[in-house]
């Protein structure tokens, strides 16, 4: 019988995970007793490790007498044994400085977030482009660039701008274009996509009949809003492929797996980072959550993700704009470091976007622990 998960067995489980994360080799009882000066014999530790294996927290490769953690073991560690850590003040200052060097550039912020996550957590990283939760129209400007061509500059709240050329009749003057753009701007002021689509059928505005040209401008705005939402849904940034492939799990020389399985794991890693395959259901879950999500190995429910753990967090401004960022790596992951890195980058992105949108940032899970350092 395996017996209860006693305090000593919890300590042994924690040490096995720490040792395995550090060395990537199965952990023997003698190693734990010697390295951590445990006040019990190797035989006692061996019995406890056997009990932990019966309970489903540990397993052992057929070629080794040592044990390694299972997904269940990692889950228990994350939820019950892991010590919560923070990035050092020096790391926070360095990261914050990098972000403020590209202040106000959304795409650059997301790409930088991926780069910093990968470098700091020593694994691959992913992030979705921030998507307006309620994309709202702000203004339309028409600029004459030729007697039969104009540039439409469509501005949405939050600094999102879309530009598109459109044909115009040669008799339309710049003043005609300005007047039409002003009328459409007033008609669609602060409207969401749903409202813009409703207004697209309007025949008049404030008693003034809308011309075919003006209704065409409304249709142009509708298409721009739809295109933006579709693009935001599909756009996934990634970084850190080399960081991830440097792990022993991707080296045939480590002896952990044969070359064929290692190559297959590399192929799946490339596919995940390139297309986001396997992350599909995780993104909406993270967007709906206010905290850090940790998904370990087989918990994904997808065979392609069985060897990976994913740590994700939502970032953005509540009710305005939001995205998801996080790290991907082997289940043998330094969870405290990875979680604290994801949490800090998400809180930093919250603050940057709140400044951009001129609103008060809503603290995310664990954000208060960074408050003093961010304003140091």
Swiss-Prot record:
SUPFAM superfamilies: GAF domain-like, Winged helix' DNA-binding domain. Keywords: Repressor, Stress response, Transcription, Transcription regulation. Signal peptide: none annotated. It comes from the Bacteria. GO terms for biological process: negative regulation of DNA-templated transcription. One of its GO terms (molecular function) is DNA binding. It holds the Pfam family HrcA. Negative regulator of class I heat shock genes (grpE-dnaK-dnaJ and groELS operons). Prevents heat-shock induction of these operons. Belongs to the HrcA family. PANTHER family: HEAT-INDUCIBLE TRANSCRIPTION REPRESSOR HRCA. This is Heat-inducible transcription repressor HrcA. It comes from Chloroflexus aggregans (strain MD-66 / DSM 9485). The lineage of its organism: Bacteria, Bacillati, Chloroflexota, Chloroflexia, Chloroflexales.
């Amino acid at each position: 019988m395996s017996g209860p998960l006693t305090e000593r067995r919890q300590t042994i489980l924690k040490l096995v995970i720490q040792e395995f994360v550090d060395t990537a080799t199965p952990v023997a009882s003698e190693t734990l007793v010697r390295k951590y000066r445990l006040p019990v014999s190797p035989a006692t530790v061996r019995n406890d490790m056997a009990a932990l294996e019966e309970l489903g927290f540990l397993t052992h490769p057929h070629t080794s007498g040592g044990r390694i953690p299972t997904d269940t073991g990692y889950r228990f560690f994350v939820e019950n044994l892991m010590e919560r850590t923070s990035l050092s003040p020096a790391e926070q200052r360095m990261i914050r400085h990098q972000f403020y060097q590209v202040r106000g550039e959304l795409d650059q912020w997301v790409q930088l977030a991926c780069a910093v996550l990968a470098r700091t957590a020593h694994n691959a990283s992913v992030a979705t482009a921030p998507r307006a939760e309620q994309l709202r129209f702000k203004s339309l400007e028409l600029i004459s660039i030729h007697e039969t061509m104009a540039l439409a500059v469509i501005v949405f709240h939050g600094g999102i701008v879309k530009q598109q050329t459109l044909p115009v009749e040669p008799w339309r003057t710049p003043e005609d274009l300005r007047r039409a753009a002003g009328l459409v701007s007033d008609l669609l002021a602060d409207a969401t996509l749903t409202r813009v689509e409703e207004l697209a059928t309007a025949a008049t505005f404030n008693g003034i009949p809308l011309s075919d040209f003006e209704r065409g401008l409304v249709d142009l705005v509708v298409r721009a809003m739809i295109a933006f939402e579709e693009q935001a849904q599909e756009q996934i940034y990634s970084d850190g492929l080399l960081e991830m492939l440097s792990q022993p799990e991707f080296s045939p020389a480590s002896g952990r797996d044969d070359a064929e399985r290692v190559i297959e794991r590399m192929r799946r890693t490339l596919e995940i980072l390139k297309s986001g395959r396997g992350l599909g259901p995780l993104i909406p879950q993270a967007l709906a959550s206010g905290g850090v999500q940790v998904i370990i190995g087989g918990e994904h429910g997808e065979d392609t993700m069985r060897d990976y753990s994913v740590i994700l967090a939502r970032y953005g401004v509540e009710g305005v704009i939001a995205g998801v960022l996080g790290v991907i790596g082997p289940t043998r992951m330094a969870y405290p470091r990875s979680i604290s890195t994801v949490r800090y980058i998400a809180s930093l992105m919250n603050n940057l976007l709140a400044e951009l949108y001129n609103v008060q940032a809503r603290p995310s899970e664990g954000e208060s622990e960074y408050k003093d350092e961010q304003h140091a």
